A protein has these predicted regions:
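A short acidic, helix-capping loop that chelates divalent metal ions and anchors anionic groups
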Residues: 65-71
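Short, flexible, mixed-charge acidic loops at enzyme active sites
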Residues: 47-60, 149-150, 319
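Short, basic/glycine-rich phosphate-binding loops at helix/coil junctions
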Residues: 58-65, 249-255
Length: 321
């Protein structure tokens, strides 16, 4: 049993920021991380061309600004370098390979007990503290849908967390399942590398530029959300015109409302839409249930590879009273 006033779960950017803030106030803590490094999503599970979608002023961690030389939209490599400097500067030392299995609050002692599996030794370890900070992210584990025909599909099947770049897919027929930001950017990267790329778009999407979102985030400080949403939709229509020509449609709800209500992000376009318009990326299905049967008929698509941009899911370890 180890005791500290504060237990932080997760050594991603949020966990590191919490640790740095506690360090500055000389508050003892322990930070538990499932992977063998901090910021594993960025270091191990992100595709090469990834850039921060938001302006750097919205993304830097507290107490240490980005270098002045960094561009407005920071690359994956630059962000990882910044996090390396951040951890070194604040002398943050996570406990790695600790998978949290259970966290429970004792109403009598007013303390949290956290049980973790040491992935190195296999032993269960226990930590206790007055405060618990859950910084494990919105989603922690790759979601692979149970699609009929997927197990018998003879080609390559990758989740977006396994995808690095499209070099190996040149001249191959690749279908990307999922039209969030990861799916859209991966489709563009595949097309840039010469793959014959198709993408499944299962629901209406808002397509905005990064500059539109930057404007919207600043306007939200001064005017109501519904007015900002109206402006974002008008700007999107002005720039991207009629989406239905290319198998896409816009939701009825506004982009910022959907983020607040459902946690669904708009697609921040960094070049994918122009490739959809030029037909370099084919929108093959606008209604895609849980069935891959059609997609796997080689007479139709001659697929050689499948990339699942189906996001991640959150696995809870908090015990409910």
């Amino acid at each position: 049993m180890q005791e500290q006033p504060v237990i932080i779960i997760g050594a991603g950017p949020s966990g590191l920021a919490t640790a740095a803030s506690l360090n500055l106030h000389s508050i003892p803590y322990i930070i538990l991380e499932r992977e063998d490094c901090f910021a594993s999503l960025w270091k191990k599970y992100a595709y090469d061309r990834l850039h921060l979608h938001l302006h750097k002023q919205f993304c830097q961690l507290p107490h240490l600004p980005f270098p002045h030389s960094y561009p407005r939209f920071i690359s994956k490599q630059q962000f990882v370098s910044y996090l390396d400097d951040y951890v070194s500067h604040f002398k943050i030392t996570p406990l790695y390979c600790r998978c949290v299995e259970l966290a429970v609050f004792d109403e009598i002692t007013k303390e949290w007990t956290v049980k973790v599996r040491n992935l190195g030794s296999g032993e269960v370890e226990e930590f206790r503290g007055r405060f618990l900070v859950v910084a494990s992210g919105e989603a922690t584990d790759p979601y692979t849908p149970e699609l009929e025909g997927l197990k018998s599909f003879p080609g390559d099947v990758l989740h977006s967390t396994q995808f690095k770049n499209g070099k190996a897919f040149r001249d191959k027929n690749v279908l990307v399942v999922g039209s969030g930001n990861s799916g859209m950017e991966i489709a563009m990267d595949l097309a840039n590398h010469g793959a014959k790329t198709s993408i499944v778009v299962r629901s209406p999407v808002h397509i905005l530029s990064r500059e539109m979102v930057y404007l919207g985030l600043n306007l939200l400080k001064y005017i109501p959300l519904n007015m900002v949403d109206w402006l974002m939709v008008m700007l999107s229509k002005l720039v991207y015109r009629e989406l239905s020509k290319y198998g896409l449609s816009r939701p009825k709800e506004g982009p910022f409302f959907m983020k607040v209500a459902d946690g669904k992000y708009p697609v921040l376009d960094v070049g994918t839409y122009s490739k959809i318009r030029s037909r370099e990326i084919q929108v093959k299905f606008t209604s895609f249930s849980r069935n891959l049967r059609i997609a796997l008929q080689f007479s139709l698509l001659f697929l050689s590879s499948l990339v699942l941009g189906t996001h991640n899911y959150y696995k809870s370890f908090l015990m409910q009273n």
